[in-house]
Amino acid sequence: MKFCSECGSDQVRMSMPYGDIGLRHICQNCGTVHYARHSMVAGCVATHEGRILLCQRAIDPYRGMWTIPAGYVEVGETLQEAAIRETREEAGAIVTNLRLLAVYDLPMFSEVYVLFSADLTAPQLMAGEESLAVRLVSPQEIDWSSLAFPMVSEALRHWMTPTGCAHVDVADFLWGPEGGVRVRRHGRISKERSG
């Protein structure tokens, strides 16, 4: 951090605030403590008559691969509002009846993903600027090797379990020695494909 976002001073230094346990950027001019924060991502597994909405990414990372609609929560938005907006932006779709599906904490990226299951109001879809294509697929038609992110695979598997939305799955995603991602789930670690 070069400048204080509060006063504009270039007198920002790393130090430990009184009573804190970590180093923070602190403005020497106005005293503002700048805390690093997690980014919140919201999205949904949206379905219509048992078929799942997938979006083909038009942007990096993972351009050309498939994902569920999701994105960063904007200031002043609830998690549900962000999931609804992202689905509309990426797939031209309207969703209702959002139910909490899963929460994924990714500390290595400073991100927390909150995913919902939701109902599509109609099967009419239109790819937005961040999508090359959008489609509805049955669970049997999912090409697991074409999915963009490990948490997308995990969320889809969780959606397909008999408990569905009944419990919140908090998984830790760990980088493996070969560059792949391992998912720690209920005490077990399973290997995911490399990204």
Feature annotation, model-predicted:
Residues 5, 13, 28, 53, ...:
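Nucleotide phosphate-binding site architecture
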Residues 1-44:
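Acidic, metal-coordinating catalytic segment for phosphate/diphosphate chemistry
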Residues 3-6, 24, 45, 54, ...:
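Conserved hydrophobic/aromatic beta-strand scaffold that supports enzyme active sites
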Residues 29, 57, 70, 118, ...:
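Active-site donor-binding loop signature of nucleotide-sugar glycosyltransferases
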Residues 170-171, 176-178:
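Polybasic "coupling" helices that flank or enter modular domains
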Residues 73-158, 162, 166-169, 181-195:
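Unchanged
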